[in-house]
């Protein structure tokens, strides 16, 4: 037994602290909570983690999270197929859906352009987006990348690549610069959608 406690506990703390936003102290609190929890609760947590890794993948059309080949949004015949909202990560779809302002389809890039981190256009799902726009009845592409330096660079790159193929709009102000979309509240995000602007 080390100063961190029994080896299995220390391993759990180490694994939990690898999660985003979880520091050493929070990892310790979570580990002790799991240790004190009934066996069924710990087993349910373990089963949920295993299940999500085994059953959740990416939609073959938009690259959002999905339990099958197509996500529920792409499979919904009531969605507006003339509009595609481009986001960086699957987590960004959730707050947009909560606004109930947007009824089109999505396209998840899988990140943002960041030359410093070695992420260029070929590392993202930009070519797939271009194919979707060229091969469909898309009249508007809403660029909802995060209002960060990398998000803005990504939006400008995509706008340039789509010039002349569809109307390209950007979410309006209301989203704080430097913030991530997944942390925006529904009202702010709804206003940003309602006031989106053209990038042509």
Where are these regions (language model features)?
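Extended, structured, electrostatic nucleic-acid-contact surfaces
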Residues: 1-20
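Solvent-exposed alpha-helical segments within well-ordered globular domains of core cellular machineries
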Residues: 10-14, 28-32, 43, 47, ...
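Extended interfacial segments that mediate partner engagement and assembly in macromolecular machines
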Residues: 27, 75-145
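Short metal-coordination and nucleic-acid-contact micro-motifs, chiefly zinc-binding Cys/His arrays
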Residues: 52-55, 67
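Short cysteine-rich clusters marking metal-coordination/redox-active sites
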Residues: 59-62, 71-74
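Short functional micro-motifs and their immediate structural scaffolds
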Residues: 64-68, 79
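Long C-terminal interaction/binding lobes of large macromolecular proteins
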Residues: 102, 130-200
């Amino acid at each position: 037994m080390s100063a961190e406690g029994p080896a299995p506990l220390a391993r759990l703390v180490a694994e939990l602290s690898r999660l985003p936003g979880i520091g050493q102290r929070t990892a310790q609190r979570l580990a002790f909570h799991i240790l004190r929890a009934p066996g069924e609760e710990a087993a349910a947590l373990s089963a949920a983690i295993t299940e999500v890794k085994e059953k959740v993948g990416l939609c073959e059309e938009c690259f959002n999270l999905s339990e099958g080949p197509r996500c529920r949004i792409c499979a919904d015949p009531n969605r507006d197929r003339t509009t595609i909202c481009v986001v960086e990560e699957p987590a960004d779809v959730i707050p947009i859906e909560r606004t109930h302002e947007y009824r089109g389809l999505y396209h998840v890039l899988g990140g943002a352009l960041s030359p410093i981190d070695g992420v260029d256009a070929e590392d993202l799902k930009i070519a797939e987006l271009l194919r979707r726009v060229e091969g469909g009845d898309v009249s508007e592409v809403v660029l909802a990348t995060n209002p960060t330096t990398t998000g803005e660079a990504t939006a400008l790159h995509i706008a340039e690549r789509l010039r002349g193929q569809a109307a390209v709009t950007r979410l309006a102000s209301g989203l704080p610069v430097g913030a991530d979309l997944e942390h925006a509240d529904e009202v702010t995000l709804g206003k940003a959608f309602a006031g989106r602007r053209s990038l042509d």
